[in-house]
């Protein structure tokens, strides 16, 4: 069917500054569902069969969560479904949804290990995939705009130590677009590749991403018309992986302790992580680790 814009709102004010509606079709209960931030840490769930008349069916309070709610159904590798309620800071809550109410234990989980990503949105009409894009809160000093959009990521469910966690991997289209710039041992960078062709299909963005699992030092420039130099080092004796942009260390991971340093901030993650994907684009570094269960920007 075709949607037509009408000249007035369809949902009266519930709370003074309620905002950020997200609407989706819930097939099992045969209705459109709207999630809405109401006030403070309160959210509402509304339903409608015609997008005109809406009924509030639930009101939820989530500690420290606010703005930009979303409610999505995710699957694990075996196809088991779980519903997830999402808020602007990347706080998420597991539960079950019947088209009317969201039943949850109220335990808050964090999708990101820092506070740069914000207000992520998922998209409709993506088949069985749940794809999310956040806004990145960067000052962009010296430029006439603030922030940037983050890498599109596909959401699914994973398990760590028996606990359910959110997996957010870069979308498969991105993975399919990568081009290798070094050999299997990573001892020799093929300079011709880095000078004569873009590392990714999107040459304008000058994006480079490679999985890191080597013992040797290598470095490259994105393209001859940029001044960005990336250097990645793995110190085998200390079991430390580090990445530098333009001679400034932006990323250090200690596999023995699980300590992860991003810029000036230090976080404690799992020890012994062996899979990392690092994406560099201009001044932005996006990291994905441990099969998509750890994300930092």
Question: Where do the protein language model's features map onto the residues?
Answer:
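A short loop-to-beta-strand structural motif that recurs across blades of beta-propeller domains
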Residues: 42-44, 91
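Short, solvent-exposed loop/turn segments at conserved positions within beta-propeller repeat blades
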Residues: 37-41, 86-87, 145-148
């Amino acid at each position: 069917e075709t949607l037509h814009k009408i000249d007035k709102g369809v949902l009266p004010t519930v709370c003074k500054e309620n905002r950020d509606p997200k609407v989706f079709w819930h097939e099992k209960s045969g209705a459109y569902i709207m999630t809405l931030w109401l006030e403070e840490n309160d959210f509402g769930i509304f339903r409608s069969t015609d997008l005109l008349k809406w009924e509030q069916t639930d009101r939820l309070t989530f500690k420290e969560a606010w703005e930009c709610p979303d409610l999505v159904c995710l699957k694990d590798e075996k196809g088991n479904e779980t519903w997830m309620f999402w808020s602007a800071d990347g706080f998420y809550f597991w539960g079950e949804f019947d088209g009317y109410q969201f039943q949850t234990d109220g335990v808050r989980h964090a999708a990101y290990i820092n506070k740069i990503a914000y207000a992520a949105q998922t998209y409709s009409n993506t088949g069985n995939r749940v794809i999310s894009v956040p806004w990145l809160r960067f000052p962009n000093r010296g430029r006439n705009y603030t922030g940037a959009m983050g890498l599109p990521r596909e959401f699914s469910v994973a398990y760590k130590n028996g606990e359910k966690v959110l997996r957010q991997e870069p979308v498969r289209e991105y993975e399919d677009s990568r081009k290798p710039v070094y050999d299997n041992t990573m001892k020799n960078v093929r300079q011709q590749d880095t000078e004569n062709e873009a590392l990714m299909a999107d040459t304008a963005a000058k994006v480079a991403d490679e999985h890191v699992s080597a013992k040797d030092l290598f470095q490259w420039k994105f393209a001859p018309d940029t001044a960005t130099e990336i250097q990645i080092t793995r110190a085998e004796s200390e079991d430390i992986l580090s990445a530098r942009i333009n001679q400034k260390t932006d990323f250090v991971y200690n596999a023995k302790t699980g300590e992860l340093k991003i810029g000036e901030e230090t976080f404690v993650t799992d020890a012994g992580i062996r899979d990392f994907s690092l994406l560099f684009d201009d001044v932005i570094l996006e990291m994905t680790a441990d099969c998509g269960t750890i994300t930092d920007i």
